[in-house]
Amino acid sequence: NEADRMTHIVQDLLTLSKIDYGKMEMNISRFSFAKAISNVYEAARLNAEQNHHHTMLFHCEDDIPDVMGDRERIEQVVMNIVSNAIKYTPDGGKIEIYAGSSGKSVFVRVTDNGIGIPEKDLPRLFERFYRVDKARSRESGGTGLGLSIAREILSQHKGEIKIDSVYGEGTDVRITLPAAPPEK
């Protein structure tokens, strides 16, 4: 509803303000990346399956290294990406979450067979307040701030986000973070 949408916008603006002024507090600790991604999957799955009739799959490699960071913020970023996949995939679509590691990094990929993003819009996705399709975003509650916030949070964790998409076919989002050094 409109009250929830306005609350979400205010929360996003407060988060951006904290980022801009270096006031965003991070609760840094060692945590299981695999467990964090599993938490996001479990939290999103019910909505995806019951409200949108999506097939939602989760694959997780064995022995993914831990991460040093703010678990809540990382889960917030991944939930934003998964929520976008749910919102912009027509009912009955498929969303996959894949967590793994490569070298000294961990990653999560979120892929969907949704509506995709036009190629001309890809370079602007991380701009504040940029929305690919304003009517579509307004209908689904988009503010144009989520991806900007996600990139800022990941940057503070020395991580990155990459988005590939084909309009009409779907989107592939990859988040990469440095793995924590092995415990002694």
Question: Can you annotate each of these PLM segments?
Answer:
Residues 85-86:
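Short helix-loop "hinge" at the ATP-lid/N-box region of the Bergerat-fold HATPase_c
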Residues 21-26, 66-69:
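Conserved micro-motifs of the catalytic ATP-binding
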Residues 27-32, 55-65:
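Conserved catalytic submotifs in the C-terminal HATPase_c
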